[in-house]
């Protein structure tokens, strides 16, 4: 992916290019690079749905610091952040990956196999709400997940939050992606925006306001990629 198409909030193209070329691309795993390039080739503009390289590196380091072994990912697309997660987990690590679009995920499967991490991934073709409710109803997964990555339908982020707080352990982390939504959350309602920006902006502003006052989590809102809200479960 070219620096000009980097999905982030850095408005200076030169600064984005510097960040990627100096620190991110040199550290990118070979199979992640291959997946990124294959996604751009096949999905063109929609390749922006994958997390950028610097965010993938951040998630990888965070998981290693946490010694995470069991995670869930809501919203997979072609699997860039999923592969980054799988590479960061130990050999016996497990990821529940949920997305209704299995076709896009197939773009990433060859790279996941080449990286030798396919055994860590349980891909479920479904909407996320159904899977979360099933996991809670089953009872075996409550409070067992170390980490959750949410990069799915924005209108359900608050609903996912309530369910994930039952599944993620105390001290575990939920990461919400796209929380700055191309910078639109800081614009006024009267400013000109694309339809998708305006629609997502409403849901993400509600989420950000809610998370800031949720006593059940410790919050760190990062201006990496398109914005990432990290929530550590307190109780």
Curated annotation (Swiss-Prot):
Gene transcribed to yield this protein: FAOMT
Q: What class of enzyme is it?
A: transferase
This chain belongs to the protein called Flavonoid 3',5'-methyltransferase
Organism expressing this protein natively: Vitis vinifera
For molecular function, the Gene Ontology terms on record are: metal ion binding; O-methyltransferase activity
Q: Where in the cell is it found?
A: Cytoplasm
Q: What does this protein do?
A: Mediates O-methylation of anthocyanins. Anthocyanins are major pigments in grapes: at ripening initiation in red grapevine berries, the exocarp turns color from green to red and then to purple due to the accumulation and extent of methylation of anthocyanins. Catalyzes both 3' and 5' O-methylation of anthocyanins, with a preference for glycosylated substrates. Active on both anthocyanins and flavonols in vitro. Most active with delphinidin 3-glucoside but also acts on cyanidin 3-glucoside, cyanidin, myricetin, quercetin and quercetin 3-glucoside.
UniProt-listed InterPro entries: Cation-dep_OMT (IPR050362), EF_Hand_1_Ca_BS (IPR018247), SAM-dependent_MTases_sf (IPR029063), SAM_O-MeTrfase (IPR002935)
User: What family is it from?
Assistant: Belongs to the class I-like SAM-binding methyltransferase superfamily. Cation-dependent O-methyltransferase family. CCoAMT subfamily.
Q: Which cofactor does it need?
A: a divalent metal cation
Q: What is its EC number?
A: 2.1.1.267
Catalytic activity, reaction form: S-adenosyl-L-methionine + a 3'-hydroxyflavonoid = S-adenosyl-L-homocysteine + a 3'-methoxyflavonoid; S-adenosyl-L-methionine + a 5'-hydroxy-3'-methoxyflavonoid = S-adenosyl-L-homocysteine + a 3',5'-dimethoxyflavonoid
